[in-house]
A protein has these predicted regions:
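A generic local secondary-structure boundary/capping motif
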Residues: 8-13, 96-99, 120-121, 142-146, ...
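Gly/serine-rich nucleotide phosphate-binding loop at the start of the catalytic core
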Residues: 11-42
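Mobile "lid/hinge" segments at catalytic clefts and subdomain interfaces of large enzymes
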Residues: 19, 166-199
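A generic structural motif
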Residues: 25-30, 94, 186-193
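Conserved phosphate/anionic-ligand binding catalytic regions in large, soluble enzymes, centered on
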Residues: 94-119
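A structural-propensity feature for long, helix-poor, extended segments
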Residues: 132-168
C-alpha cells in the first residue's frame, strides 16, 4: 500500500482537488472480449451523441483543463488523457488495444472524463507518492510519447521522480502482461463528485475481466 500526499502547490492552484485510489492484486491478460464489447458500445454512443467541440466542455474534462491553466500549462497543446481519448474516437480512430488493464483504465476514463493514472504498483519506488507541479527540465518519458515536457503539469512523484500526469504516465511504471499489482488513481480536479463511482467501476471491470483480490 502507498500513502498519497497532495503538495501545498497543488492545494493552492487547485483547491477543490480530490482523488481516489484503487490497489488490487491482478492477473493481466492480452485481451478481454467482454471489455471490448463495452468499449465499442461506448464508442458508438459517444460518436452518435457528441460533437468534437463539445468534449472540452464536459465538466470533469473542463475542470482538468482549468487545473492545467492554473498550474501553468496550455491544455490546447497538452490535452488531458480523457479528452485526448474522446477526441480520438470522434475522429474515427479506434483505441489502441494494449492489454486488459490498460484497456479498462481507458474505458473508465472515457466514461467518466477523469484522467486516471494506472501504474504497476511493484515498479513504484518507495512507500508514498506526492502530487505536485512539474518543473522545467524535469525528466519524464511518457508512454508512447518519448520525452514529455511536464513543466506546469500536475505530476505524481515517487522516490525516483515523476510517474504520472493527466496527459501521460511514465514508461518506468507502466503496466504490462507481467503486472500482478495495480495502483489506479482517479483525479478529480472538479472535487469529489464521481470519484467513488469511478473507483468502483475500475474494481468492477477488473473483477469481470479476471478474478482478482482487491485490498
Amino acid at each position: 500500500m502507498f500513502e498519497i500526499k497532495v503538495s501545498q502547490e497543488i492545494k493552492d492552484a487547485c483547491p477543490v482537488f480530490a482523488g481516489a485510489a484503487v490497489y488490487a492484486a491482478v492477473k493481466n491478460t492480452a485481451y478481454c472480449e467482454g471489455l471490448w464489447k463495452e468499449i465499442n458500445a461506448f464508442t458508438e454512443e459517444l460518436t452518435t451523441t457528441t460533437q468534437i467541440e463539445d468534449i472540452k466542455h464536459q465538466p470533469v474534462i473542463a475542470a482538468t483543463r482549468e487545473a492545467y491553466k492554473r498550474c501553468g500549462k496550455d491544455p490546447g497543446r497538452y490535452r488531458p488523457s480523457a479528452e485526448a481519448l474522446r477526441r480520438r474516437l470522434m475522429r474515427g480512430i479506434p483505441l489502441y488495444q494494449i492489454d486488459t488493464l490498460v484497456d479498462l483504465i481507458n474505458l473508465v476514463s472515457l466514461r467518466t472524463g477523469h484522467s486516471i493514472g494506472g501504474f504497476d504498483a511493484d515498479k513504484i519506488q518507495g512507500a508514498y507518492l506526492e502530487l505536485g507541479i512539474g518543473k522545467a527540465g524535469e525528466p519524464f518519458e511518457g508512454i508512447g510519447k518519448g520525452v514529455l515536457n511536464i513543466e506546469g503539469l500536475p505530476v505524481y512523484r515517487d522516490a525516483s521522480g515523476g510517474i504520472g500526469t493527466p496527459t501521460s504516465d511514465n514508461e518506468r511504471t507502466k503496466m504490462n502482461l507481467g503486472t500482478t499489482h495495480i495502483l489506479a488513481i482517479v483525479n478529480g480536479y472538479n472535487g469529489k463528485k464521481g470519484l467513488k463511482e469511478a473507483a468502483e467501476m475500475i474494481l468492477s471491470l477488473i473483477h469481470i475481466s479476471e478474478p482478482t483480490r482487491p485490498y
